[in-house]
């Protein structure tokens, strides 16, 4: 389990997060929703171990983040930040392989790379120069890179693993957004990964998430199931914007402007 207890983060005298507590279970997709500046990315950074003052308040599989070496942490969780800048020319296969230092045999590394590329339907990009790809292609390659880091079969995994994604569908068209979230659900269901994803698209969250965290001005406004969170009163309080919630033909809520 990945948990945060009463997270408080200040930067330059400004409170970014106040008493934020969340819990992510293996096999669960948790979406963090909120307006710009709500603290969503900072929360993800805290959960990943990138905010030093928050480490004592975050626990991964029962252990405080402070007790993990960087190598052990890399094998237990993988992080995709909001933007990734690559200034050097790498082949796609080389980039995806970067997180696989713990695998000694090159043939095993290549098998893991191929598996990750196949998940996102980008096998044909394997020998392409990353810098020649479109923004959407680069986004899917970065997703393959972080997912490859955790693709140990569940029977061989020492402990549950966690995937932390910040706006992972940026630059992706409609079809690829849904393809990515189908992969996310597969990772949660088949590999029993816990997934935390920061999102702006409430309809993607409604369709694919198991649990929602509503963050407003650095505080948890509420959290719970999709059905209990995506109701007009809560959404309007979260975004200060009127909405309607309609039933999708397949059962999940669908949010439109009022």
Curated annotation (Swiss-Prot):
UniProt topology in membrane: Peripheral membrane protein
Root EC class: translocase
Parts of the chain that traverse the membrane: none
Molecular function via GO: ATP binding; ATP hydrolysis activity
Pfam families (UniProt xref): ABC_tran
Keyword line: ATP-binding, Cell inner membrane, Cell membrane, Membrane, Nucleotide-binding, Translocase, Transport
UniProt cross-references to SMART domains, sorted A to Z: AAA (SM00382)
Every ABC transporter domain range: 2-242
UniProt-annotated binding residues for ATP: 34-41
Enzyme Commission no: 7.6.2.-
One Gene Ontology term, aspect cellular component: plasma membrane
InterPro entries: AAA+_ATPase, ABC_transporter-like_ATP-bd, ABC_transporter-like_CS, P-loop_NTPase
Subcellular location: Cell inner membrane
Function: Part of the ABC transporter complex HmuTUV involved in hemin import. Responsible for energy coupling to the transport system.
Family according to the record: Belongs to the ABC transporter superfamily. Heme (hemin) importer (TC 3.A.1.14.5) family.
PANTHER family (UniProt xref): HEMIN IMPORT ATP-BINDING PROTEIN HMUV
NCBIfam families: PRK13548.1
Quaternary structure and partners: The complex is composed of two ATP-binding proteins (HmuV), two transmembrane proteins (HmuU) and a solute-binding protein (HmuT).
Protein name listed in UniProt: Hemin import ATP-binding protein HmuV
Protein species of origin: Hydrogenovibrio crunogenus (strain DSM 25203 / XCL-2)
Highest classification ranks of the organism: Bacteria, Pseudomonadati, Pseudomonadota, Gammaproteobacteria, Thiotrichales
């Amino acid at each position: 389990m990945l948990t945060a207890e009463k997270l408080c983060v200040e930067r330059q005298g400004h409170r970014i997060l106040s008493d934020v507590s969340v819990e992510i279970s293996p096999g669960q997709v948790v979406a963090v929703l909120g307006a710009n500046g709500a603290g969503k990315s900072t929360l993800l950074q805290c959960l990943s171990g990138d905010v030093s003052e928050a480490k004592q308040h975050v626990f991964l599989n029962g252990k405080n983040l402070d007790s993990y070496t960087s190598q052990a942490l890399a094998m237990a969780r993988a992080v995709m930040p909001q933007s990734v800048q690559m200034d050097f020319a790498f082949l796609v296969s080389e980039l995806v392989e970067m997180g696989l230092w713990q695998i000694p045999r090159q043939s095993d590394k290549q098998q893991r790379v191929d598996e990750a590329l196949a998940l996102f339907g980008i096998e044909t990009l394997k020998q392409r120069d990353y810098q020649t790809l479109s923004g959407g292609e680069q986004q899917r390659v970065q997703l393959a890179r972080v997912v490859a880091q955790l693709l140990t079969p569940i029977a061989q995994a020492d402990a549950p693993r966690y995937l932390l994604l910040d706006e992972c569908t940026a630059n992706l068209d409609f079809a690829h957004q849904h393809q990515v979230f189908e992969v996310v659900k597969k990772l949660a269901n088949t590999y029993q990964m816990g997934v935390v994803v920061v999102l702006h698209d409430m309809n993607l969250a409604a369709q694919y998430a198991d649990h929602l965290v509503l963050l407003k001005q650095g505080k948890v406004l509420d959290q719970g199931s999709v059905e209990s969170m995506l109701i007009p009163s809560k959404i309007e309080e979260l975004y200060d914007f009127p909405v309607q919630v309609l039933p999708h033909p397949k059962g999940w809520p669908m949010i439109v402007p009022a």
